[in-house]
């Protein structure tokens, strides 16, 4: 208000849309698109249990590394407490929720070389499937490789195929299945869901009652 702002912060609105000749629609964006090669880095969103500030550290170093390689860096994150949302970290900052509908519109506007999801924790990793489905390049580890690592069942099958030893385990989708599975395994048991990081939803149980 008191002086001209030079900070490349962008906040979206759903009031104006652009329609391509093929009928595809996305939100209008005032950000000036350059002809530089560029990458988008997805942040981790707000801090919460199971996902801490270490992913912000990863995002910042990812942005700096991309800059050193000559890329224009575009950060998408919505946490004002992080370093990745500082005005002098990335070339552009979209202060947006790390949700698909926001990210897709930005990708359609900026047309990056690809998207980096591996640095933003579980929040960013969950976007990988959508990116792969829509044919948007994921820089680095592919969605299938990410899913292979996060799906406990697929990962254990891989370990079996590679003859790598691992603790006894089982997969249950209902309480009854978990109870029956516990009869075949010895307590204490480490119970945890797939597709989480940082121990979210993890519990050690020592008997059926705790299970």
Where are the regions that the model predicts?
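N-terminal beta-alpha lobe that positions the nucleotide/phosphoryl donor
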Residues: 1-211
């Amino acid at each position: 208000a008191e002086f001209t702002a030079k900070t490349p912060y962008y906040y979206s609105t759903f009031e104006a849309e652009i329609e391509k000749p093929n009928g595809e629609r996305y939100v209008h964006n005032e950000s000036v698109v350059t002809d530089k090669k560029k990458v988008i880095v997805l942040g981790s969103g707000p801090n919460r249990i199971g996902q801490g500030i270490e992913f912000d550290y990863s995002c910042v170093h990812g942005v700096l590394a991309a800059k050193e390689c000559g890329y224009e860096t575009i950060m998408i994150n919505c946490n004002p407490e992080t370093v990745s949302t500082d005005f002098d970290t990335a070339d552009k900052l979209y202060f947006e929720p790390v949700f698909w509908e926001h990210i897709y519109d930005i990708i359609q506007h900026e047309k990056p070389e690809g998207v980096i999801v591996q640095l933003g924790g579980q929040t960013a990793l969950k976007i990988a499937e959508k990116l792969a489905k829509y044919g948007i390049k994921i820089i680095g580890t592919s969605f299938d490789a990410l899913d292979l690592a996060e799906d406990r069942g697929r990962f254990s099958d891989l370990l079996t195929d590679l003859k790598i030893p691992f603790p006894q385990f089982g997969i249950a989708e209902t309480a009854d299945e978990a109870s029956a599975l516990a009869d075949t395994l010895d307590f204490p048991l480490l119970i945890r869901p797939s597709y989480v990081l940082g121990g979210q939803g993890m519990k050690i149980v020592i008997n059926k009652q705790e299970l």
